[in-house]
Regions:
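Substrate-binding pocket helix/loop in short-chain dehydrogenase/reductase
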Residues: 110-111, 115-123
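A conserved structural motif in NAD(P)-dependent oxidoreductases
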Residues: 228-240
Length: 269
C-alpha cells in the first residue's frame, strides 16, 4: 500500500514541470488527483506557457499509475472556476484531503524598470491565486471534519532577498505569512499548512536566459545570492515532489507551519 493510499489531492499548475511531477509522484504513492493548469499565456510571464497537450500528458502519466484523475483548464486568478473544479472532484471522487498550490509565474526586471503590470501579474497569480486555491477547498475541509493538508510551493526566494524578481520575491514571501496564519487559525481542526522553499529546478521556469544575463552582468555583486552551497547547479522536480509526498502523508500528521527548505544550501548564503 502506498504512502498516500486514500488521499485525494487538488493540484494547480500541473501541466508540466514541478506540478506534473507532484501529480505523478502522488499517484504512484496511491493518491487520486484533481489537476489543473491555465495552459496558455499569463500576462507578462517571461516563461513560455504550458499547453493543453502538456496537461493531457500529465493526465496520461497519472492514468498509467492506475489512479483516478480529474482535470480541467483553470486560471487560478478565477476563484469560481477553482471552486467548480474542486466541487467536481468532490462529487466524482468523494472528498479532498490535500491541496498542492503549485501554480506560479516568473518575470524579471531591474526594479527601477519594473512596470505596474509586471508587478500585478505576479502578485495576482502567485499570491492571490494561492489564496483562491485555498479558499476553493478550505470550506470542504471544515465541513468534512477530518482535517486536511495545504502544501504551498513557495521558493528559496520566499526566505531570502532575490534581486531582479521583486514581484516574485514579494509574493513568495507573502506565501509564508499565509501558511503560518492558516496553520495557527485552523490547527484546532487538524488542518495543516506548510510551505516548500526550493532552489532552482530543471523546469521551463528554471531555465530563464534573460534573468541569467542580468545576473551575469553583476556576477561579483549578486551572483552568490543565486548559488547553492552543495555541488549541484539545479534540483530535479522529484526532489521537490519527495517533500510534497511527505507533507501529504500521515508521516507528517503533526507537521504544520513549516517552511521546508529543499535548497542545496541556497538560502544559507
Amino acid at each position: 500500500m502506498g504512502r498516500l493510499a486514500g488521499k485525494i489531492a487538488f493540484i494547480t499548475g500541473a501541466a508540466r514541470g514541478q506540478g506534473r511531477s507532484h501529480a505523478v509522484c502522488m499517484a504512484e504513492e496511491g493518491a487520486d488527483v484533481i489537476i489543473s493548469d491555465i495552459c496558455g499565456p499569463v500576462g507578462t510571464s517571461g516563461v513560455a506557457p504550458a499547453t493543453p497537450e502538456d496537461l493531457a500528458e500529465t493526465v496520461r502519466l497519472v492514468e498509467a499509475t492506475g489512479r483516478r484523475v480529474i482535470w480541467d483548464r483553470v486560471d487560478v486568478r478565477e476563484p469560481e472556476a477553482l471552486k467548480a473544479l474542486a466541487q467536481r472532484g468532490i462529487d466524482e471522487l468523494g472528498y479532498i484531503t490535500t491541496v498542492v498550490a503549485n501554480a506560479g509565474i516568473l518575470n524579471w526586471s531591474r526594479t527601477h524598470e519594473l512596470t505596474q503590470t509586471q508587478w500585478q501579474d505576479v502578485i495576482d497569480v502567485n499570491l492571490t491565486g494561492t489564496f483562491n486555491t485555498v479558499q476553493a477547498v478550505l470550506p470542504h475541509f471544515l465541513e468534512r471534519g477530518q482535517g486536511g493538508s495545504f502544501i504551498v510551493i513557495s521558493s528559496a526566494a520566499g526566505l531570502k532577498g532575490q534581486p531582479f524578481t521583486l514581484g516574485y520575491t514579494s509574493a513568495k514571501h507573502g506565501l509564508v505569512g499565509m501558511v503560518n496564519a492558516l496553520a495557527i487559525e485552523y490547527g484546532e481542526y487538524n488542518i495543516r499548512a506548510n510551505s516548500i522553499h526550493q532552489a532552482g529546478v530543471t523546469t521551463p521556469m528554471g531555465d530563464v536566459p534573460g534573468l541569467g544575463e542580468l545576473i551575469g552582468e553583476r556576477a561579483f555583486t549578486v551572483g552568490p545570492v543565486f548559488m547553492n552551497t552543495m555541488p549541484v547547479e539545479m534540483l530535479e522536480p522529484i526532489d521537490v515532489s519527495n517533500a510534497v509526498v511527505y507533507l501529504a502523508s500521515d508521516e507528517a500528521r503533526y507537521v504544520t507551519g513549516l517552511q521546508m527548505k529543499i535548497d542545496a544550501g541556497l538560502v544559507g548564503r
